[in-house]
Amino acid sequence: MIPTATYRLQFRNGMTFDRAAALVPYLKNLGISHLYASPIFTATKASTHGYDVTDANEIEPSIGGREGFERLVAELKAQGLGLIIDIVPNHMASSLENAWWRDVLEYGKESRYARHFDIDWSRRLTLPFLGDTFDAVLENGEIAIKPDPATGKPAFAYYDNYYPLAPATWQGREAEILALTDKAAIADLHERQPWKLMSWRDAARSLSYRRFFEVTGLVGMRVEDKTVFDDTHRLILELVRTGAVDGLRIDHIDGLADPKAYLARLRQEVGPACYITVEKILAKGEQLPDDWPVSGTTGYEFIASLAEVLVDDEQIDNLRQAYETVKGAPVDMRAELRAAKLLMVDRNFEGEFTRLLALALSIASELQIAQEESVVRQALRELLIAFPVYRTYGTAEGLPPTDICLLHRIVERVKTLETPPQPEALTFLSRLLTGDVPASSQEEATQFRVRFQQLTGPLMAKSVEDTLFFRQNMGLALNEVGAEPVTHHFSIERFHHEMKTRQARQPDALSGTSTHDTKRGEDARARLYTLTEAPEQWSECLARWRQMNQTHVKFLNDGTAPKSADTWMLYQALTGVWPPVLQPQDETGLNALKTRFEAFVEKALREAKLRTDWVDSNEAYETAMLDYARYLLAPDNQTFLQDFYRSLQPFIRAGLVNSLTQTVIKLTAPGVPDIYQGSEALNFSLVDPDNRREPDFATLAQQLDQLTPGVFSREESWLNGQVNQYVTAALLRLRQQNHELFRFGDYIPLRAVGQRADKVIAYARVNHDDALIVVAPRLVFAECDGLLSQSHSGFWSGTDIIIPGQLNQHRYRNVLTKERLMPGERLSLASHQGGVLVLMSD
């Protein structure tokens, strides 16, 4: 069954199955068809998100276990709602809490699970969980031989962790082993284990297993092996087959060795009715492979499409110039992207790159092709850096035709570099990737292809989303998962084109605007888009605020903190997160915001990897930056706070109009709208873990029944999210009543004419005799200096929407105001408050 709308709920951190069951009546009333659950399987005890699974065949006891899950399912079914769960086939926790992993540690290559995990068994399994080298930790007395409290067997004890010994190294002399205190003897015992403990700092260069991105605590799984697939999906398949679960969201599909084969096997097991979406980041213009048996993506590309509507393309260059003036230098985003990718290849993914290089050189040697290591290294490095998408989808048979064309374009681009790699090396690597090698080397070439494809995705994610987007802060709203790193022109025409393509290619994909992974909540993003409409006003504000807080800038050995570019980021981030109802005198509210903002600032600085890093933190710099950030929100900093609050008002109001437009589009454009918990009202969250905070469900449920069209005329209803919640509920119910229109209806752009024609977006959805007309405002910052609740009919005077022949014969009902009208050939906006119209044909 294809959902009409999903509601993402984050379990753990207090959210249990029973608490979720209590929310089901609210979700039904809101108009949701399917609850969309974060991972529910047993994860590490400290897990806050559930992606660090320790047992894929057990439901997490701390959130209610199997019995609690069954109660939730029963309540969902009683209310007529379905359930979608988030599954994680790519990885599990490399934790001692994981019985399979623990078995591998104890028995090494002889473990029944040795091939479940993606481990390089040509060497000892590396465990990068020490604070220093093994020798240093041993010398400091931090490690010893003790009985494991859980099993009683001898183990290497490091604080609260007990690493099991291989049976052959202790059985028959248990007392002797437990009595070991001599450091040389302990070191010798360590050398005889199938694993080796090492410093976490050495993971990037020495890890012997595939990890999720840079997270050593998450080990890759070999689900391409049927045994591994069966073992990791036993409970998942049971839940689908028994009808408890109606859909699956596949986490990090690009991490798998063969996504297509995995999805084909999964589809065969769950049947045609199961709704399947994949977490897949698509570049602009990129589409999912046609032969994947899924309904579509989880929708990050939809966020990027919305920017086409809400960014002022005519003024964004002025914002860019202002940013470069503050920064003190022009920004070459292509060069910045290259620098970020170089850092990832050379440092953060050094081990993965080295393994890939060694594999290529081994194949060259087998084929007796003369290739110098330095030459192949440069060619491989440049290919990885030049990759414009997350990955290709080659198999043992080679690359599909579209990916071969992509590879050829990349190679040609690499050849134009100022210092290009040798053509022979590029040709050799291309042959490995396309499978153009003798039969004797096909297996190794396939392995190279798989490893290459499993590296390009993490490389792209960590260099763009988690480095570049924290370094270059011209427009934080554009620094989002799924966004293009190199700024392009924005246009409604492109948005219309992308929606037509979406309707044709993946009409059942999720359309998300906030997730647990987005860099900021959808309404923070909507507000920050308005900076592109008023770059001069923003620049004047920034200069004034910097001057007000200048005395809190510190002078350090490596420069000032914050630097001018840092302040651009800080004030813009604060602009995005500031709650609309927060007053400068509200000390409690300021302190709550300060706690959230501090955590964001620390993460933003470390992700940028410029003056501090997760690997080597710069304490002096971080302290200075955090002190500055705290002062911004200090209750006694009233001169700044009053000015900030006053200056923010037009941005807040224009942002709320953007929020409404964004909501209307999400609920009426092609795709299945996904509501992230609490986002039916307003979501001004920062990057995780801030975006995983639980919303006030009690208030949301209580106010829903009280909402009427009158919310548009109450200023407080705009500021507290009631307008968005009312519109969300009204349109979700409309979707339920007109499922086929929204699923199959054509997407038809409508033309605006008149004085404010560039200030609206308009389109229709048409399926047989059913028609929907949607009109929403955009780029109205200049009109938002007054109250949102005021009528702005004068602003829209003389602006009409041209209604084509197949639509202008209908009578329509305004879904948001309940009025009825027959627009004819021209729909005048002057008589409709705010320019927001959702008209459903009678």
Language-model features: where?
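Intrinsic-disorder/coil detector with helix-boundary
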Residues: W101, I145, Y158, Y162-L165, ...
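Hydrophobic "anchor" residues on beta-strands that sit immediately upstream
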Residues: G82, G247, Y275
